[in-house]
């Protein structure tokens, strides 16, 4: 793909848009970056791309800019159905995303990881498994390092491990990973998709360009993933819910075994794994299959499982105060993630939820909240919705903010109980992102008097 002299519009000026602009300019293209936001809200990125040599258009989109482009590259947060993009398509202008663009310049095999929950942990763990096996890996994508950064850079890895969101999959065309992994499909982003069918169809796109020489790693217990199997051409391996004739992982006490049909090939121990919860055993199994399919050794996979310490804001232990433990699960931005968090605790939980609703069905938490929660503290825009859904299951405290929620929870929690931030919502009503929310929670907890 030759970009030299082409007029390219990069839509969205955040991390991805800035990286796309740099990449395309490096390839000799003429680049315009378009964003509906103001220069004040975008901060230093505006001057950054201008200094690179790009034009910048802010505010309402200019139709002519889009319809006269040679190529449009959109960031994940930009809906691919907005009117200016539809008009450009009608004029024959290709509209793709950053992942599709980068993949056309990447020679190394790609391991693509998608799914509602667990994908960042799995992506990171695969990278560790590859490196522990002596195979150099670039780990990026939706995890915070756009793939175009790898495509632009001089240092090349033997394999690319990429976290891919549903929004990114909506704009792929020829993207064809050697290994595609789908962790699970549960309700999320219902504010953007027209029901679960549309969301699941987006996730299924990760497999669409694979061939029989490739590998699809699937969750056999997930009904949406199972429904995709008939349309997948790649070899299918299951990290959970494997049926007798299928290839994949079978869990037993403290270990996981890899089978193809009735034949056992290898076994991995989970005894030294520091990640807690059944969901993290599934994450380890999924990562192990993907890494093995890409050439990692069993020894390297085992070493990475033993050494991996987990990621921030994912049921991360923060501190113990007066025999009460505090956990930061800010990354839990949907209902299923909250369920997974609650499943991992035997002690009564003081649960902090809230933020910006993504269209989740909070009533699905009713039974688990009744079993596990001592109190529920609600914050942010979704406080009313969560209260309506769960007020009959647990005492609900209107906290408003995370700081107040921690204050109320500290007063109420008894020795041996736990306080868990697991919001079940996006963070954008009060914070820039889930990381900022998690850091704020940790700040408040660490400031508590002992």
UniProtKB/Swiss-Prot annotation:
InterPro entries (alphabetical): Mur-like_cat_sf (IPR036565), Mur_ligase_C (IPR004101), Mur_ligase_C_dom_sf (IPR036615), Mur_ligase_cen (IPR013221), MurD (IPR005762)
Keyword terms of this UniProt record: ATP-binding, Cell cycle, Cell division, Cell shape, Cell wall biogenesis/degradation, Cytoplasm, Ligase, Nucleotide-binding, Peptidoglycan synthesis
Pathway: Cell wall biogenesis; peptidoglycan biosynthesis
SUPFAM superfamilies: MurCD N-terminal domain, MurD-like peptide ligases, catalytic domain, MurD-like peptide ligases, peptide-binding domain
Main localization of the protein described in the UniProt heading: cytoplasm
Any one Gene Ontology molecular-function term assigned to this protein's record: UDP-N-acetylmuramoylalanine-D-glutamate ligase activity
NCBIfam families reported for this sequence: murD (TIGR01087)
Family: Belongs to the MurCDEF family.
Protein name: UDP-N-acetylmuramoylalanine--D-glutamate ligase
Organism: Desulfatibacillum aliphaticivorans
């Amino acid at each position: 793909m030759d970009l030299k002299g082409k007029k390219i519009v990069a839509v969205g000026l955040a991390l991805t848009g800035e990286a796309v602009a740099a990449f395309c300019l490096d390839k000799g293209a003429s680049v315009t970056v378009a964003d509906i936001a103001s220069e004040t809200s975008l901060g230093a990125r505006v001057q950054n791309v201008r200094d690179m040599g790009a034009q910048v258009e802010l505010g309402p989109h200019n139709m002519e800019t889009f319809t006269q482009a040679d190529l449009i590259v959109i960031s994940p947060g930009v809906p691919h159905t907005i009117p200016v993009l539809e008009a450009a398509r009608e004029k024959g202008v290709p509209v793709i995303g950053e992942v599709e663009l980068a993949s056309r310049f990447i020679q190394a095999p790609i391991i693509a990881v998608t799914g509602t929950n667990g994908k960042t942990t799995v992506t990171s763990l695969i990278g560790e498994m590859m490196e522990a096996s002596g195979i150099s890996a670039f780990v990026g994508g939706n995890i915070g390092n756009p793939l175009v950064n790898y495509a632009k850079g001089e240092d090349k890895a033997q394999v690319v491990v990429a976290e891919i969101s549903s929004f990114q999959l909506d704009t792929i065309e020829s993207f064809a990973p050697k290994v595609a992994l789908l962790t699970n499909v549960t309700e999320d982003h219902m504010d953007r998709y027209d029901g679960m069918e549309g969301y699941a169809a987006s996730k299924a796109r990760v497999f669409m360009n694979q061939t029989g020489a490739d590998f699809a790693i699937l969750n056999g217990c997930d009904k949406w993933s199972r429904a995709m199997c008939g349309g997948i051409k790649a070899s299918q391996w299951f990290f959970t819910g494997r049926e007798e004739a299928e290839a994949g992982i079978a869990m037993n006490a403290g270990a996981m075994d890899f089978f193809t049909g009735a034949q056992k090939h290898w076994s991995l121990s989970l005894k030294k794994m520091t990640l807690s919860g059944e969901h993290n055993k599934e994450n380890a199994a999924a990562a192990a299959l993907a890494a093995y399919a890409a050439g990692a050794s069993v020894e390297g996979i085992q070493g990475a499982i033993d050494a991996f310490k987990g990621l921030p804001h994912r049921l991360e232990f923060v501190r113990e105060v007066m025999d009460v433990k505090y956990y930061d699960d800010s990354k839990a931005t949907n209902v299923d993630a909250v369920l997974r968090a609650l499943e991992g605790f035997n002690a009564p939980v003081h649960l902090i939820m809230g933020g910006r609703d993504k269209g989740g069905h909070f009533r699905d938490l009713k039974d688990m909240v009744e079993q596990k929660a001592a109190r529920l503290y609600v914050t942010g825009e979704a406080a009313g919705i969560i209260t309506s859904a769960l007020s009959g299951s647990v005492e609900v405290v209107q906290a408003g903010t995370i700081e107040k929620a921690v204050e109320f929870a500290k007063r109420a929690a008894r020795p041996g109980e736990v306080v868990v931030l697991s919001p079940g919502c996006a963070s954008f009503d009060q914070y820039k992102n889930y990381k900022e929310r998690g850091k704020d929670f940790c700040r408040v907890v660490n400031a508590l008097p002992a």
